[in-house]
């Protein structure tokens, strides 16, 4: 079960990724985490990435694809994986396909921009575990405390309105075209594509995902 989640920042991907990972026992692969661990481990790819980053350059698509290929060979990916934050552009999606990384499901979370802004501004996180809450839509049992540990919740630096609006503009320009790309891939039977109404309750969306993925 190899899954890509698409949708603007704040569309609810993180919450549902957590649900999918727990229910189906597949790892969530974040390109940011992969880069950091490859650099830390001093692997050949990690050293190449570090050299680029040290010179203030962006890590190339080829290098990220190579990291993804290396990561999905690991034992925890034998039943599949969930890709987080990649691909972001059509060239990246093409490169992934050319590298033989096939995807079973593309799930697109659709939410209007104004609701996304409301969602992100109210978001609270438990940094050590990555658990995500919302003061209105998905509140913790005790205000501003993590349900599991009871530790204080925090606000991400990126969760301020001006930054959110900039990220939405970037998403619509860069990543939104992937929706039609994967719809065409699904028509050609290369993958299965599902549009998810992300404005509903967390539990309703999780239920729909279960029906799709079971």
From Swiss-Prot:
Residues 30-59 are annotated as: NMP. It is an enzyme of class 2 (transferase). It holds the Pfam family ADK_lid. Pathway: Purine metabolism; AMP biosynthesis via salvage pathway; AMP from ADP: step 1/1. SUPFAM superfamilies: P-loop containing nucleoside triphosphate hydrolases. Keywords: ATP-binding, Cytoplasm, Kinase, Nucleotide biosynthesis, Nucleotide-binding, Transferase. Catalyzes the reversible transfer of the terminal phosphate group between ATP and AMP. Plays an important role in cellular energy homeostasis and in adenine nucleotide metabolism. This is Adenylate kinase. It comes from Photorhabdus laumondii subsp. laumondii (strain DSM 15139 / CIP 105565 / TT01) (Photorhabdus luminescens subsp. laumondii). The lineage of its organism: Bacteria, Pseudomonadati, Pseudomonadota, Gammaproteobacteria, Enterobacterales. The gene is adk.
